[in-house]
Structures are given as structure tokens and as C-alpha cells.
A protein has these predicted regions:
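Mixed-charge (Asp/Glu-Lys/Arg
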Residues: 1-125, 130-145
Length: 145
């Protein structure tokens, strides 16, 4: 999958913090731009974490719901009823961090967590984000690719 355009809005602040153990932590921020094309692409990217566009018609079959109604009423966390807004915010942040890990740090990040949610207003239990870096012949897995 090509790098989504919104990932270009992520930028290092140029400041670092340190953990209690003295490990440096880079600070990044999202420099949002009012670009309708990038926002539309990002919306598709976000939506596809919950329900792949290629599967939505099959999944909503028999529900009598439009695509939009299916997503809003059955897949996405509720926008207004608690704890939906906090779940929505957390999901958004996790997806953005997964994009950072995959497209900036160059790890492979599985993207099935949100599609498998059984309760739309509940966080999926388990690992939030995991990234894999695969070994290439002749390199140890600790070497950057």
C-alpha cells in the first residue's frame, strides 16, 4: 500500500524529552493543512480500518442500511453517546500512530484490529499497535533496513 498523503503532515518538532531512564523521545506533531483531496483520501484510509470498501456491500446485505448508515450505526464508535467519543478519539490516535510506525519507521503493521470489533463503543482488547521488521538475507534483524 502506498504511503497515504496525510503522513506527510507528520513532522518532528525538533525537541526531545527523556524518559526516567534517560532514553530520548522524539516529539512529533500533525501539521494539518486544509487540503480537501488529502482529507478525503485520509477519510477513506480511516474508514477502511473498520470496513474495507470492497466488503461493505456484502457485510451490510440484509440490514436495509445504506453504506453510510451501516458505518455510522454499526461500525464506527458513536459520535455522541459515551463512551463512543473517547473510543473514537482513541481509535483515531492508534491509527495515526500505526501510520507513523509503518510509513515513517518502516515497520510492517497489521491492520485488522478495528474491522474485528464486536462492540463499536468498546476498545478492542489486546495489543494496540505492533510493528514487525523482517530480516533480510545477510542482515541481522536489529539492523535497519
Amino acid at each position: 500500500m502506498p504511503k497515504p498523503s496525510h503522513v506527510g503532515w507528520l513532522a518532528k518538532v525538533g525537541k526531545t524529552l527523556k524518559t526516567k531512564d534517560g532514553v530520548p523521545i522524539e516529539i512529533w506533531q500533525l501539521n494539518h493543512k486544509p487540503d480537501a483531496d488529502v482529507l478525503s483520501e485520509w477519510a477513506v484510509h480511516f474508514r477502511n480500518h473498520y470496513c474495507d470498501d470492497k466488503q461493505i456491500d456484502l457485510l451490510r446485505k440484509g440490514t436495509r442500511l445504506t453504506r453510510s448508515e451501516y458505518l455510522v450505526n454499526l461500525k464506527f464508535p458513536d459520535a455522541n453517546i459515551k463512551p463512543g467519543p473517547s473510543i473514537r478519539s482513541g481509535d483515531f490516535a492508534e491509527i495515526l500512530v500505526a501510520d507513523y510506525v509503518e510509513y515513517i519507521l518502516k515497520f510492517w503493521v497489521p491492520r485488522i484490529r478495528y474491522a474485528d470489533k464486536t462492540m463499536r463503543n468498546e476498545s478492542k482488547k489486546g495489543s494496540d499497535i505492533i510493528g514487525f521488521r523482517f530480516q533480510q538475507a545477510g542482515k541481522s534483524s536489529r539492523e535497519k533496513q
